Amino acid sequence: MSNLPPKEFMPKHIGIIMDGNGRWARERGLPRTEGHVQGAKVFKQIMDYGHDIGLEAMTFYAFSTENWKRPKDEIKALMQIFHEYLTEADETKYEREKRGFYLRVIGDVSGLPMTLQLLAKSACLAMNNKDAMVVNMALNYGGRQEIVHAVQQIAEKVKKGELDPKDISEDDISAGMYTAGLPDPDLIIRPSGELRLSNFLTWQSAYSEFWFDDIA
């Protein structure tokens, strides 16, 4: 790690748009599902590397609200991959805590299969180490949907008389984000060559740097 820049120049939070798996598989004559299997392996490697270099948080865009439009067999394969990963994460959560990082599943979890909802809840421990790294796994996530979620929370406070509409601030909206309490992403990476955010961390990425590359 000696080639890393000084800590003050290191990002605190990196977001990664996990796409390009299907094309990777196609170019190698493999089924799209195999691309997702390999992507899951890379996810674990990157997560460990982020921990080793001292990041505060990483957010992985694993499954968007728009991904339900994909072929049913591909969705089924993805749900199986998520099930296997979260099962493993649940079994190793205390070991992971000792290593110094915590898993969070963010997004509209209620839209996932019930088995995944239960695993997502069980695999995520309450954070007892403020110096640990947080890994956000974004499932059934959409940036616009997240903003709507935050606004709904604010509207509920206004309805109850807990907040005056004139006092609503950016901080109130940020507090309703799934990533509340974490620094906004300094850097967002998309490795597929696509030059767009695709509804990822829409609110939080206002001042992010972007790295788009084609490494498939």
Model-identified regions with their sequence ranges:
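Flexible, compositionally biased loop and terminal segments
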Residues: 1-216
